[in-house]
Design a protein with these regions (language model features):
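Membrane-anchoring hydrophobic helices of lipid-metabolizing enzymes
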Residues: 1-68, 73, 103-107, 111-113, ...
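General secondary-structure edge motif
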Residues: 4, 34-37, 89, 148-149, ...
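Non-catalytic C-terminal accessory region of glycerolipid acyltransferases
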Residues: 9-10, 14, 18, 56-58, ...
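Short, flexible segments with low predicted structural confidence
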Residues: 29-30, 80-81, 102, 140-142
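Residues in well-ordered beta-strands of folded domains
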Residues: 49, 92, 192-194
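Catalytic core of membrane glycerolipid acyltransferases/transacylases, capturing the structured
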Residues: 60-121, 147-154
Length: 259
């Protein structure tokens, strides 16, 4: 309802909830299917809009930062960029439990040419190295997992989003490219790469510039998600009011940064 607004009938909301779980199931099916797919099939299933923004950055010798929501099938695009586009691709991912599941996903992503960095203390150095080596860097940025992010307005409510994309762009000059990869009804993926979000120093304090740019990214992510809200796989609480509501019914969920 945050995405669609108050005027949308309840039955439509319920229908989209069902479609969201169907989309999430498709994500998992594709995840297990992609390693067995021939490169030609990955190429034929991909419609890439805005890939010129990526080429422009790499040709200039700097790795672009693709800022993505947890939506659709971003891994298909990552494999296409690596196997068909010939790019070096680095993705920062959330560690999964149990560790065997994380190791499985890391292995199949690396098998198809992606470099995987686990979110954690060593991630910063790894992503700086990737940008300097002109890798395409994929950052999922619609959820503040560590609880150390920037407060923004996101779909009409205050929450926090990761500071990493804006901070990296300010420090390296890497372009920030809002990106989303949508499931097509007939199979395959349509990936949309938008023009760069403006990145420049304006304030005396770096934190103020990071806040401004992160808010701009939040607005860009809103637009991408609204194109296909049923494909947004946000299956966890993401706003303070979500946690408050769960606590009110006796089902508390750890807040970001809490064990």
């Amino acid at each position: 309802r945050r995405i669609l607004g108050e005027g949308v009938p309840q039955h439509r909301i319920e229908q989209l909830v069902v479609e969201t779980f169907a989309s999430y199931a498709r994500y998992w099916v594709d995840s297990f299917r992609l390693p067995q797919m021939p490169v030609q099939a990955i190429d034929e299933g991909m419609n890439f809009v805005g890939v010129d923004h990526i080429w422009r950055a790499v040709d200039a010798g700097v790795g672009p930062i693709l800022v993505l929501p947890h939506l659709g099938g971003w891994e298909w695009a990552g494999f296409w960029l690596s196997l068909v586009g010939g790019f070096d691709v680095t993705a920062v991912v959330e560690p999964l439990e149990p560790p065997d599941l994380f190791d499985f996903f890391t292995a199949f992503r690396e098998e198809l040419g992606m470099h995987i960095v686990a979110l954690g203390p060593d991630a910063g150095a790894a992503v700086l190295r990737a940008i300097n080596e002109a890798h395409v860097l994929c950052l999922l940025a619609d959820r503040d997992i560590e609880g150390t992010g920037i407060e923004v307005d996101f779909f009409g409510e205050r929450t926090t989003l990761p500071a990493g994309p804006a901070t990296l762009a300010l420090r390296t000059g890497a372009p920030l490219l809002p990106t989303a990869c949508y499931f097509k009804p007939t199979g395959g993926i349509q990936c949309l790469v938008e023009p760069p979000v403006p990145v420049r120093r304006e304030a005396k304090r770096l934190r103020e510039d990071v806040t401004r740019i992160t808010q701009d990214l939040a607005r860009a992510l809103e637009g991408l998600i609204r194109r296909a809200p049923e494909q947004w796989h946000m299956q966890q609480p993401n706003w303070p009011s979500d946690y408050d509501a769960l606590e009110a019914i006796g089902k508390p969920h750890p807040r970001p940064g809490q064990p």
